[in-house]
């Protein structure tokens, strides 16, 4: 149980090795934790608004965050200093490094008379001059705003999930849409996470389902159904398991008892689409989930402001579907 945020968690992410866990929340200060024992290693001070998203690069050298203060910041992971701060015209909803770490992408909200836009920047020699540089690509989103985003294979494409449930793939060399999922989801996409090999990804949607998609064709492969909005979903790196977390929207939560089971982490079998376990813990909706890269534990961040890291016992690995 990691206590260090004063307000609800917005996103959590492990680095590639899994020794560090990064968390962002609405209290303006992203944190980094040592995932093995839950020790807080430091905070990244500098944002003036709720931090909506974060991502750490492949080498755990740089951290990118996007916030409601209309900036994207790139940080030095080890020293906690700001390498670059990029101003935007509305709050930043998603931000991700590419696999190579040479580029980063971020998207802004449709607000204050501004359209939602997707930006791609070159971060190879990131320094304070990045705020004056033009992005290498900007794509205006005409229809619905972006609510989650992933880099496709080989840094050639970007997969975007939208507020209307649509998913699209963009070719960043041409700057145009190449694949559109249509209406597999009927409500907004809250989260998307890739499988370990990058061939598929899982979506979490307000329409109470999570779905598994092929990451090149956007073909819907599997559907995991629940009774309430899904805020986050993650794929196990070692087993055919998916974990879903959610609950009602923060606005609709009353003081229900946790026994109602609305705020559990729910485990589904990736292929059979059957739920086989639930884990309690949070006193409110789960906003973000992440599997440890070794697949032996997972972390969840909730509306209650806590991050919980849970290790699996041996019975979890003796697969019940064999």
UniProtKB/Swiss-Prot annotation:
GO cellular component: eukaryotic 43S preinitiation complex; eukaryotic 48S preinitiation complex; eukaryotic translation initiation factor 3 complex, eIF3m
Molecular function terms from GO: RNA binding; translation initiation factor activity
Keywords, ordered alphabetically: Cytoplasm, Initiation factor, Protein biosynthesis, Repeat, WD repeat
Cross-referenced PROSITE patterns: WD_REPEATS_1, WD_REPEATS_2, WD_REPEATS_REGION
Keyword Cell inner membrane belongs to the record: no
Assigned protein family: Belongs to the eIF-3 subunit I family.
Subunit comment: Component of the eukaryotic translation initiation factor 3 (eIF-3) complex. The eIF-3 complex interacts with pix.
Protein's recorded name: Eukaryotic translation initiation factor 3 subunit I
Gene coding for it: eIF3i
């Amino acid at each position: 149980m990691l206590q260090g945020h004063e307000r609800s968690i917005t996103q959590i992410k492990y680095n590639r090795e899994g020794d560090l866990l990064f968390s962002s929340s609405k209290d303006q200060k992203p944190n980094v934790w040592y995932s093995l024992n839950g020790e807080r290693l430091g905070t990244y001070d500098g944002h003036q608004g709720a931090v909506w998203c974060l991502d750490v690069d492949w080498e755990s050298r740089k951290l990118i965050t996007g916030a409601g203060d209309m900036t994207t910041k790139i940080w030095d992971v080890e020293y906690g200093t700001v390498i670059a701060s990029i101003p935007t015209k509305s709050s930043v909803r998603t931000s991700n490094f590419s696999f190579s770490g040479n580029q980063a992408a971020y998207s802004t909200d449709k607000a204050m008379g501004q359209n939602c836009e997707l930006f791609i920047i070159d971060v190879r020699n990131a320094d304070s001059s990045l705020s004056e540089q033009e992005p290498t690509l900007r794509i205006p989103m005409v229809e619905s705003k972006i609510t989650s985003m992933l880099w496709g294979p080989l840094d050639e494409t970007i997969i975007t999930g939208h507020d209307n449930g649509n998913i699209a793939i963009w070719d960043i060399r041409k700057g145009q849409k190449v694949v559109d999922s249509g209406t597999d989801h009927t409500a907004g996409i809250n989260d998307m996470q890739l499988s370990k090999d990058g061939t598929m990804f899982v979506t979490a949607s307000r329409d109470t389902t999570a779905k598994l998609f092929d990451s090149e064709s956007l073909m819907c492969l599997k559907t995991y159904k629940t009774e309430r909005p899904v805020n986050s979903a993650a794929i196990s790196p070692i087993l055919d398991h998916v974990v879903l977390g959610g609950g009602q929207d923060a606005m609709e939560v009353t003081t229900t008892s946790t026994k109602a089971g609305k705020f559990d982490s729910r485990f589904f079998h990736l292929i059979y689409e059957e739920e086989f376990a639930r884990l309690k813990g949070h006193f409110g909706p789960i906003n973000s989930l992440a599997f440890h890269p070794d697949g032996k534990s997972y972390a969840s961040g909730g509306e209650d402001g806590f991050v919980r890291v849970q290790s699996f016992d041996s019975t979890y690995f003796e697969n019940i579907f064999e």
